[in-house]
Amino acid sequence: MMENGFSCILIEDEALAIEMLQDYISRRNDLILLGTAIERSEIQSLLRICSPTIIFLDLVIPYGDKNDFNYSKFPESSIFVIISATPISHYNGEIPNGEIHELLKPISFEDFNKCIDKILRNIKVTNV
């Protein structure tokens, strides 16, 4: 946790989804967006400069070579919010290890808030 809230990064390739999620994150006083990556090659650079508590992750990032980044490079303590049109149960690709929450597109602000509230409650219970 940062002094004024929980740090997060956004990994997403769709412009409208990026804009919407950046707006949702900015509406919450307890979240601090440290950066956004739209290509696999940008993820590692972003993680070199920050260690986010929460990672908003689109599972399908078409830009960049699969060798540019793999999920084992994420901080082990990070909490993942998977943002996708495909439910995780139907996804056949790689999924990161760790605590995972899911938001299906299109994402309403109400669903976003419920997800974040649940994550923050879990963090507070764990830290008690």
Indicate residue ranges for each PLM-predicted region:
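As written
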Residues: E94-L103
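C-terminal output helix
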Residues: H90, I107-K118
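Conserved acidic carboxylate
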Residues: E12
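Acidic, metal-coordinating helix/loop segments flanking the phosphotransfer/catalytic sites
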Residues: Q22, T36-I54, P62
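Short amphipathic alpha-helix used as the core "switch/output" element in two-component signaling
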Residues: D65-S77
